């Protein structure tokens, strides 16, 4: 039996983005100044021309992702769960959900065990925000 290597979910996410980028030139990855934390930096290293750091601006990131999807790209927008679901909720609903755009949202660091970042980064309500 093959030995299972235990790695963080976010590391698997980064690896998967790189694999998808190799298979599909329309994949583009956006993050909100969190490339190291969400592991989108792995994609950035492999495909710098298809990575967009939107800064600490999740709402804007979702709007950019919606525009890219409308233009035929396959965007993966990545942030912490609190900000991807909470801060950007209206943009996700109006700019992605209503027009049924193909935007993938990668939300890491959900729940209450996000280490030293504290209560502002903890998100238990992400499931209720996104249960549409």
Label for each model-derived stretch:
Residues 1-42, 46:
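Conserved acidic/glycine
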Residues 3-7, 82, 119:
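Hydrophobic alpha-helical scaffolding
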Residues 10-14, 59-62, 89, 123:
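Short, well-ordered alpha-helical scaffold segments within catalytic/effector domains
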Residues 35-104:
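Thiamine diphosphate
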Residues 112-115:
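A short acidic, helix-capping loop that chelates divalent metal ions and anchors anionic groups
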Residues 117-128:
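Phosphate/diphosphate-binding glycine-rich loops and adjacent basic-rich segments that engage nucleotide
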Residues 130-132:
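Conserved small/polar residues in nucleotide/adenosyl-binding loops
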